[in-house]
């Protein structure tokens, strides 16, 4: 490691604490309270407290430390992570049928994220604001309005970017974790007996004593590890080493101390179960703690919102969601983006959730199903990568998968008990997103196949035009083409109706590669097809936004001079009608038509000046 890297490591690690660990770092606000609140039939008693603490600690070790930080984070695509990245990696060296199954798993995992993300900001901010019940019980009626006000301000600042306030995230979250550790240590010193719960036998004893009830209670324990998937998704921003270093040096010790501190408090004062986190603090510290807790939950919510923006952009670029307006809020950091439609849809959903559920305890009942479902899918996809891409021994990989599923499946099954009490919400939202993504992908493929099934050979058409050219007019024409070897619809219709062709014709294809970024050296490939025809293929990664002006600049560097304001861009505009279909495919077709009508137009996607665009319409039956 270079000196520069050594000097920057503390800064990167601090930044990772500020962004990556917001969700899991605010879990102590509500996790132990939900475990011991009485909903599972046992109260605050020694065996239950020790059992839950042991389960929480060893889940943090096994799921976060071993599974995600040690194993899953090995699977990266040019340093990037996330469930869709894992899906892409897993499908590289498998058969077509297996790849299809892996794609479905990846899309379900991505859809689950959309379902869970509606709950995370609501439960985080509400659990912090609920500290008012301890500070000033008469203000408890203000919890819902204040939660909505805080989140409204958060969603409103998204369009301005978070670069400025983002600099404060790291020191605030570091302060938060130090407070977690300090409060917990203070309580543990007063009752060190609680440290016996570090022994995993207490978790075993918990299952043996409480039997079926203990299994159902796993639905509350899982609240302690929500946010684990974010570690993998944010790997590209901070790097594996920084995320691991932050976890083992700051986050894990702080969480452990705080959970065990809450346990020590409950052993001495069972009545503290109404809010064990805030009751850890002395009276004089309650208001400052309430403020820092609110800030920490806002930061956790911001991390989730940014994650939704990133996942949406990746899904759009990979062709699973319709094109939509994506705004870059930072000239320095390509990952800082703002998607207005997603932002305000998420805001409306979060407000509805807060008003409907009214208390974080009610929201906890809806939390966990999507998280644990994603955990199961991550285990399957990551072990597939280990076998197919890393060529690990199949028996060793099978043992790893069995070990992961022995934890993931019980957690997921236990959370199914929440289905009627709120778990239906993330599942419903996830199902809607899965239908939307699969509909857009499959119907888009159907449309392209329909448009080009009777197409002639591109090479034959160019040869014919060069041999018997139509009237040529001065200038350059660019025809956008979705596929490399097919004749653009706009070109055929221009020849059919206008019977003219520009002196120079460029067939431009913008391609998304299976990588987050494409090096500038490989950005543009130029091929001269004839004296007057050129093919330009511009490649972009799924974390990049295509820009035609940049493509023209690259073409100029390679000898094909193009000027944006002297070029005409011909594009086809399809008017779609539904053909004869079974009723269920007809419903899917209607959904696709709705998505198509609201999709961002190509000139806006690629930042082409509107006065240089000529759209030629055609009717296509799908």
UniProtKB/Swiss-Prot annotation:
GO molecular function annotation: potassium ion transmembrane transporter activity; symporter activity
Reactions mediated catalytically: K(+)(in) + H(+)(in) = K(+)(out) + H(+)(out)
Keyword match Cell membrane: yes
Residues passing through the membrane, by range: 9-29, 49-69, 103-123, 137-157, 165-185, 213-233, 247-267, 276-296, 337-357, 363-383, 396-416, 419-439
Enumerate the subcellular locations listed in this protein's record, separating them with semicolons.
Cell inner membrane
The annotated topology with respect to the bilayer is: Multi-pass membrane protein
Tell me which UniProt keywords the record has, alphabetically.
Answer: Cell inner membrane, Cell membrane, Ion transport, Membrane, Potassium, Potassium transport, Symport, Transmembrane, Transmembrane helix, Transport
Q: What Gene Ontology cellular-component terms does the record carry?
A: plasma membrane
- Which Pfam family, just one, is annotated for this protein? K_trans
Keyword Acetylation found = no
Q: What family does the database annotate?
A: Belongs to the HAK/KUP transporter (TC 2.A.72) family.
Q: What does this protein do?
A: Responsible for the low-affinity transport of potassium into the cell. Likely operates as a K(+):H(+) symporter.
Q: Please give the name of this protein.
A: Low affinity potassium transport system protein Kup
